Amino acid sequence: MAVQESAAQLSMTLKVQEYPTLKVPYETLNKRFRAAQKNIDRETSHVTMVVAELEKTLSSCPAVDSVVSLLDGVVEKLSVLKRKAVESIQAEDESAKLCKRRIEHLKEHSSDQPAAANMWKKKRMDRMMVEHLLRCGYYNTAVKLARQSGIEDLVNIEMFLTAKEVEESLERQETMTCLAWCHDNKSRLRKMKSCLEFSLRIQEFIELIRQNKRLDAVRHARKHFSQAEGSQLDEVRQVMGMLAFPSDTHISPYKDLLDPARWRMLIQQFRYDNYRLHQLGNNSVFTITLQAGLSAIKTPQCYKEDGSSKNPDCPVCSKSLNKLAQPLPMAHCANSRLVCKISGDVMNENNPPMMLPNGYVYGYNSLLSIRQDDKVICPRTKEVFNFSQAEKVYIM
């Protein structure tokens, strides 16, 4: 029964932690399937049109040259259809194989062989680190770690490298790469009600104002803002007011609109939409796992000012993680466990807690082990007491 519960808990942990591992390649497969369907439907309609034209021509006793020309057109369209179909199927097959490879990898966690299970845990840790490094912008380090660990097909490097290109273009104050990304994911972004493309068009308008190309800015507004409504319409009205002010104005809100820091806001907006598009959280799995682990073992003893109650074996008590865990909640413990300061053993009915006259509590077995001539020395205060002075503690 305990084994079944442990397996169920592990399965639930995998579902929570490994969701991005399967979701990202699945979304890529889904996207390629839809693109393939559109391409094949489009090319099929082209073939149907030229075949219909050929049939219409044949019904009126045409010249041989015109028939040959139409047949060449049919052959050309069929060749294009075949090429597009092969390319689409290959792309889908690659994504399907990647999904299968990751599923097989996740199944390895239930191996009965300790060595295989430990290897799988190491790979999972490496995968978490690679994703965290990619999120932090350490792309070269992440790629090297993935290559050395042999997990290149188990992490979402391609997605983050694509995002890197978009973010770098926005840092250069260019919008074309990000707009192309919006076009590639147009249907999904529309379902998400993303306003990233609108924000990019607003920024293009602002840059035209900055360059004093006001007629171009008006043409740009007519082309891209004619369908604006709701809150977007209010924003359009605001930026249109920039036409009446010089590009170096100090009047709000136009001064804020001309602030180059808006490009950093666009990067943050793209990053947010990119994570939503692939159904990823704002924090990496590594960060979430680390915070959950620290919170699970965090106690008030880890933050005593005198430092006397800190445990050298406790990660939260360590200098590097103590500050990191400070804003996290304390461990939830329905049933307290008393641990002896001397031996580290749990104090229970077989090792009852004993309180010395100075108020410090130790396990009975530990006091026996340090007793000399019926005397015990408190490890904390170095005070000496008779063994008989120790009193049993009862927890209500």
Swiss-Prot record:
PANTHER family: E3 UBIQUITIN-PROTEIN TRANSFERASE MAEA (PTHR12170:SF2), MACROPHAGE ERYTHROBLAST ATTACHER-RELATED (PTHR12170). SUPFAM superfamilies: RING/U-box (SSF57850). Pfam families: CTLH. Its EC number is 2.3.2.27. This is E3 ubiquitin-protein transferase MAEA. GO terms for biological process: cell adhesion; cell division; cytoskeleton organization; enucleate erythrocyte development; erythrocyte maturation; negative regulation of myeloid cell apoptotic process; proteasome-mediated ubiquitin-dependent protein catabolic process. The record marks C314 as: Essential for ubiquitin ligase activity. InterPro entries: CRA_dom (IPR013144), CTLH/CRA (IPR024964), CTLH_C (IPR006595), Fyv10_fam (IPR045098), LisH (IPR006594), ZF_RING_GID (IPR044063). Residues 1-124 are annotated as: Extracellular and involved in cell to cell contact. The expected RING-type zinc finger domain is highly divergent and most of the expected Cys residues are not conserved. Still, the protein is required for CTLH complex E3 ubiquitin-protein transferase activity. In addition, the conserved Cys-314 in this highly divergent region is required for ubiquitination by the yeast GID complex, suggesting a direct role in catalyzing ubiquitination. The gene is MAEA. It comes from Gallus gallus. Residues 159-216 form the CTLH domain. A zinc finger (RING-Gid-type) spans 314-381. Identified in the CTLH complex that contains at least MAEA, RMND5A, GID8, WDR26, and RANBP9 and/or RANBP10 as the catalytic core. Interacts with F-actin. It catalyses: S-ubiquitinyl-[E2 ubiquitin-conjugating enzyme]-L-cysteine + [acceptor protein]-L-lysine = [E2 ubiquitin-conjugating enzyme]-L-cysteine + N(6)-ubiquitinyl-[acceptor protein]-L-lysine. Core component of the CTLH E3 ubiquitin-protein ligase complex that selectively accepts ubiquitin from UBE2H and mediates ubiquitination and subsequent proteasomal degradation of the transcription factor HBP1. MAEA and RMND5A are both required for catalytic activity of the CTLH E3 ubiquitin-protein ligase complex. MAEA is required for normal cell proliferation. The CTLH E3 ubiquitin-protein ligase complex is not required for the degradation of enzymes involved in gluconeogenesis, such as FBP1. Plays a role in erythroblast maturation and in the development of mature macrophages. Residues 121-153 form the LisH domain. It is found in: Cytoplasm; Nucleus, Nucleoplasm; Nucleus matrix; Cell membrane.
